[in-house]
């Protein structure tokens, strides 16, 4: 399938004149349209700053002490070029010979800006002399003097007392707001009265559904240039209420990736102006939910201003507040404090602040359906706030799509953030580190070898935009993906609602099975992303509840629709590979379903064997551990059915310790039985004979199972040149294994009625002013007025995150009462799951009345031992087989990767 052709990718010639057709500053703004009809029929809008309007031109602000102006004809006499002002495109470089390079004009002097190390946050009026007093020049003979003059204290903010008049375009409120001089003085930009993407922030008050964004005549800056910019990479950072450090961590990683692509001067796609092909979109889920410190960081970057947003436009509720700005600032984090400094590369930013909390799936609707439809990007990258991509990881993801035309989606390696290993001291973090590592070494390579990865993590993944599109009938991957937004209410079936807790799994399946297409999914080992993992048991349980329920029901959906793969255009061999993978997933899911019973049976068989070896002590331990096992498991069920993890943390921690002791006892039993078997074989046969030793079925199954898992994990980790987790996290993972089975699984199944994401939308945001159009088509708005106000507001935002963030203790809100239908379904699932595992236990142990079918006690014991031996052999050999299958898949992935790298060695540079 050929990819849709977007606009030309070639960078602008540096001699082009560029101006924005949407110049709409948020100081006193009037529209000077030729006629109402001209405005109504135009695709562009244009407004004029009052100091430059209607023949009253004067300039209130010049960052240079000398006051020298831009020498273009327009700047000398704007009224003489009235028509040109309305028709000229957005021009980031108004003067061809200006020193700003390809992205703007740099003033000849900035106050204190030569000192790169100067802190952003200083005392009163730290940004330099009063720009409204041109006569105050301490060095009239030297316009380039570096020493700043003493300055008066800024006047109080007057921004709420000024009313501006603006013209709405097609009923949409769109404003261009001047950037605070405090920020503007630190970056290259056009000189007044010229303006560019660095001097103004663009605000749009969206009053529509994301799907209607384009139809309602909303647009984005990239489409307003004389030569619209092609978006090769569209990156979205989704967030809820993450603090400033988490957001800054992600944003820093993204900026470094853009700098890396800007540095690839020999690339056919990237290079000096690579930043023009990349748009970074930040979507925040709810105006009342966003962390004020994070919002202040966005303001420091220039992409947000307080006092601009509106509640309603002509009686229509605003659904999202959209801010656009090309920032030249970057972030750094030192000792937990976020700092802002001048960056090396401009970054096109789009900040979408949703009015209501509508969950992450709705944030993705704004990204794909609203903004994606306007920009028509090639590759879309999804990142969660808090995940930090490696310095070239975004490029590596893009490269996977560039090398494989039929790659519809790709993901990288998600790593647990360890802070130089310090967090490994927490056993819960170490356990998750091991889990992530083995998944990236065994599971993802195996699935990538088949071409179908069951889930591309939403925390760090990428998709080809054209592959996501629906067909003419409106059916396709995005249609299935966004169906989940409507599944979180009473109108949804509980099965479907749980399934859409993992809608990214549904999206992956719909991509590879898309009708008449042959898209595949790939794992990119060289692309990495670090993320924070839960550090407390309550957090961990809540997170895994959603993961386990969503993945289980989504896997059932994929397997039930596995034959949909035949509607695709894949080759017969590829379809056969998919079917083999589906069989593997079915077996894995069956083991997951019976994990509770399997673990208890292994525990009972091994401890029963151990009591014969230890005598009386073994029998006492066997009885004590068996009763405690059952008691703790019942306690876990009761807590899961009626208590929140946050309110039962001590109970859960006690159970974690108990299951750790149980696992340690099991490992001791395995080693002890193995050693005793070897000693017995040597004693009986007068020497060591491996063939005779393997005739002992319990010993043989134990050895094969251990070798096929633990030893294989070490071998494959060494082959992948990443073995350190085996030494730092392996023991913790072993001890936590029963917790995964007996706590996480039980809590997940006991809470299938809870289809929330752990967030509530009951907080009400502060009321904003509304905008209503008058008879002449104009509207009055309240907004900041002059440079002093803008600077004071900017300083206020900087001080919000000037100190280290301290976590506040969250007061839990009253839980909403769940519907009886959901609770009934939950009870049915739990009962069915419990009875399945109880039936398996009774069958293997010949208990629950099955022992009465044999009258002879010796024969009954023999029959029980035989059933236990057969069961243990089936389970452990199955584990060995699945492990071998994963190993082969991982090796095949590695071989293909090495061969591909060899073949590309002499290919052109990307």
Swiss-Prot record:
Name of one Pfam family that matches: Chitin_synth_1
Keyword terms of this UniProt record: Cell membrane, Cell wall biogenesis/degradation, Glycosyltransferase, Membrane, Transferase, Transmembrane, Transmembrane helix
Membrane topology: Multi-pass membrane protein
Name of the top EC class for this enzyme: transferase
GO molecular function annotation: chitin synthase activity
A GO cellular component entry from the record: plasma membrane
CDD domains: Chitin_synth_C (cd04190)
Region (Disordered) location: 56-156
Catalysed conversion reaction: [(1->4)-N-acetyl-beta-D-glucosaminyl](n) + UDP-N-acetyl-alpha-D-glucosamine = [(1->4)-N-acetyl-beta-D-glucosaminyl](n+1) + UDP + H(+)
Location in the cell: Cell membrane
InterPro entries associated with the record: Chitin_synth, Chitin_synth_fun, Chitin_synth_N, Nucleotide-diphossugar_trans
UniProt xrefs under SUPFAM superfamilies: Nucleotide-diphospho-sugar transferases (SSF53448)
Compositional bias segments (type: Basic and acidic residues): 57-84, 130-148
Primary location recorded for the protein, binned into one broad class: membrane
EC number(s) stated in the UniProt entry for this protein: 2.4.1.16
Listed transmembrane segments: 366-386, 448-468, 583-603, 620-640, 655-675, 701-721, 730-750, 828-848, 876-896
Gene Ontology BP terms: cell wall organization; chitin biosynthetic process
Family: Belongs to the chitin synthase family. Class I subfamily.
Family matches, as PANTHER family: CHITIN SYNTHASE, CHITIN SYNTHASE 1
Biological role: Polymerizes chitin, a structural polymer of the cell wall and septum, by transferring the sugar moiety of UDP-GlcNAc to the non-reducing end of the growing chitin polymer.
Record's protein name: Chitin synthase A
Gene that encodes it: CHSA
């Amino acid at each position: 399938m050929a990819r849709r052709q977007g606009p030309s990718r070639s960078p602008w010639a540096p001699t082009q004149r560029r101006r924005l057709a949407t110049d709409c500053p948020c100081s006193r703004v009037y529209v000077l349209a030729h006629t109402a009809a001209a405005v109504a029929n135009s695709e562009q809008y244009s407004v004029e700053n009052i100091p430059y309007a209607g023949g009253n031109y004067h300039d209130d602000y010049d960052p240079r002490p000398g006051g020298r102006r831009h020498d273009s004809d327009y700047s000398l006499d704007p009224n003489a070029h009235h028509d040109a002002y309305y028709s000229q495109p957005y021009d980031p470089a108004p003067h061809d010979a200006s020193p700003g390079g390809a992205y703007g004009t740099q003033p000849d002097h900035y106050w204190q800006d030569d000192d790169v190390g100067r802190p952003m946050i200083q005392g009163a009026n730290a940004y330099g002399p009063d720009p409204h007093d041109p006569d105050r020049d301490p060095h009239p003979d030297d316009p380039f003097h570096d020493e700043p003059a003493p300055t008066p204290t800024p006047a109080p903010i007057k921004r709420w007392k000024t009313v501006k008049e603006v013209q709405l375009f097609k009923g949409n409120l769109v404003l261009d707001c001047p950037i605070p001089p405090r920020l503007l003085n630190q970056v290259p930009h056009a000189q007044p009265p010229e303006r560019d993407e660095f001097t103004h922030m663009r605000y749009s008050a969206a009053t529509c559904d994301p799907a209607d964004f384009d139809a309602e005549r909303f647009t984005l800056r990239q489409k307003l240039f004389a030569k619209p910019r092609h978006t090769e990479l569209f990156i979205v950072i989704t967030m809820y209420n993450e603090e400033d450090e988490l957001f800054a961590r992600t944003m820093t990683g993204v900026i470094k990736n853009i700098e890396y692509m800007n540095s690839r001067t020999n690339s056919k796609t990237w290079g000096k102006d690579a930043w023009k092909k990349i748009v970074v979109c930040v979507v925040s889920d709810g105006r009342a939910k966003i962390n004020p410190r994070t919002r202040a960081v966005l303001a420091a970057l220039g992409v947000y201003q307080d006092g601009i947003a509106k509640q309603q436009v002509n009686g229509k509720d605003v659904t999202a507040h959209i801010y656009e700005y090309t920032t030249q600032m970057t972030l750094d984090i030192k000792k937990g404090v976020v700092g802002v400094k001048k960056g090396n590369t401009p970054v096109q930013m789009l900040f979408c602040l949703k009015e209501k909390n509508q969950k992450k799936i709705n944030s993705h609707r704004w990204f794909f359906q609203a903004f994606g439809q306007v920009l028509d990007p090639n590759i879309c990258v999804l990142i969660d706030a808090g995940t930090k991509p490696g310095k070239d990881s975004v490029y590596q993801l893009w490269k996977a799509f560039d090398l494989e035309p039929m790659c519809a989606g790709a993901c990288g390696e998600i790593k647990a953030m360890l802070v130089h290993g310090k967090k490994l001291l927490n056993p819960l973090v170490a356990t998750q580190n091991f889990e992530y590592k083995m998944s990236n070494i065994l599971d993802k390579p195996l699935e990538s070898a088949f071409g179908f990865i069951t889930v591309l993590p939403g925390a760090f993944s990428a998709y080809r935009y054209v592959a996501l599109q629906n067909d003419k009938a409106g059916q396709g991957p995005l249609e299935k993906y966004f169906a989940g937004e409507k599944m979180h209410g009473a109108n949804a079936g509980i099965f479907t609602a749980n399934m859409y807790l993992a809608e990214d799994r549904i999206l992956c399946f719909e991509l590879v099975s898309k009708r008449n297409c042959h898209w595949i999914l790939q794992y990119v080992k060289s692309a990495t992303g670090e993320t924070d993992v839960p550090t407390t048991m309550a957090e961990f349980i809540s997170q895994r509840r959603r993961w386990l329920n969503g993945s289980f029901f989504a896997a059932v959906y994929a397997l039930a629709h596995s034959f949909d793969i035949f509607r695709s255009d894949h080759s017969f061999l590829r379809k056969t590979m998919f079917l083999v993978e589906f069989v593997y997933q079915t077996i894995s899911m069956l083991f997951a379903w019976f994990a509770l019973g399997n673990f208890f049976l292994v525990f009972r068989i091994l401890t029963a064997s151990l009591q014969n070896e230890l005598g009386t002590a073994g029998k006492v331990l066997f009885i004590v551990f068996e009763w405690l096992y059952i008691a703790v498991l019942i306690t876990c069920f009761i807590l899961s059915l009626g208590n929140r993890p946050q309110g039962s943390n001590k109970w859960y921690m006690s159970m974690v310790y108990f299951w750790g002791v149980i696992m340690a006892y099991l490992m001791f039993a395995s080693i002890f039985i193995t050693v005793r078997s070897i000693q017995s074989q040597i004693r009986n046969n007068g020497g060591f004979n491996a063939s005779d030793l393997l005739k002992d079925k319990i010993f043989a199954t134990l050895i094969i199972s251990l070798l096929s898992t633990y030893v294989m994990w070490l071998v494959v980790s060494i082959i992948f040149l990443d073995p350190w987790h085996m030494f730092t996290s392996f023991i913790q993972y072993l001890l936590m294994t029963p917790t995964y089975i007996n706590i996480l699984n039980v809590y997940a199944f006991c809470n299938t009625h809870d289809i929330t994401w752990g967030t509530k939308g009951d907080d009400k945001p502060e009321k904003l002013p509304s905008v209503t159009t008058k008879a002449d088509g104009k509207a009055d708005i309240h907004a900041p007025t002059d440079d002093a106000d803008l600077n004071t507001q900017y300083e206020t935002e900087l001080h919000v995150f000037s100190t280290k963030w301290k976590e506040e203790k969250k007061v839990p809100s009253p839980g909403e009462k769940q519907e009886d239908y959901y609770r009934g379904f939950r009870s049915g699932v739990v009962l069915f799951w419990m009875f399945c595992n109880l039936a398996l236990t009774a069958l293997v142990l010949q208990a629950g009345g099955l022992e009465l079918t044999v009258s002879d006690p010796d024969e009954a014991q023999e029959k029980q031992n035989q059933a236990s031996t057969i069961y243990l052999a089936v389970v452990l050999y199955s584990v060995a087989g699945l492990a071998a299958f994963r190993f082969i898949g991982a090796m095949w992935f590695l071989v293909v990767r090495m061969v591909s790298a060899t073949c590309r060695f002499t290919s052109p540079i990307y």
